Regions:
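Metal-dependent amide/peptide-bond hydrolase catalytic core
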Residues: 1-133
């Protein structure tokens, strides 16, 4: 279960628990069980306080002649998990197609562009750190 909104996320979990409870009541026995373990959360609340990292990525993309497209992600990524472990990791580049499918792929040009953006981010961070002491 994933959602952009924490309240809706909790509501979805509650609905599932109620469905299982109602199903068991309808059958007058335990025919279904549910166990919910949270794995991913919306990383927005971890990224927003450190939003300069998104701006840094946006500037790096522009310097590489790549038009940044900011699209919310509902979690389900390593970046979401890492963000909640204290390392804010917005998803800044995809480029892949047919994710999680038999025909998943990423074009070489997309990988090259991702590398250029990463180098641009590193350069900007290095320049800022050397200018600030």
């Amino acid at each position: 279960i994933r959602d952009f909104n924490k309240e809706n996320f909790e509501l979805r979990k509650s609905r599932l628990e109620k469905m299982v409870k109602d199903l068991n009541l309808d059958h007058n026995e335990t025919v279904a069980e549910i166990s919910i373990k949270d794995q991913y959360y919306n990383m927005k609340e971890m990224i927003d306080p450190q939003y300069y990292i998104v701006e840094l990525a946006r500037e790096a993309m522009l310097s590489c002649n790549i038009g940044p497209v900011v699209v919310p992600v509902r979690g389900g990524t390593d970046g979401s998990r890492l963000s909640y472990m204290g390392l804010p990791c917005p998803n800044i580049f995809g480029g892949g197609h047919n994710f999680h499918g038999e025909y998943e792929y990423i074009p070489t040009k997309s990988m090259e562009s991702a590398c250029r953006v990463i180098v641009a981010i590193i350069s900007k961070v290095y320049l800022n750190s050397s200018q600030n002491g």
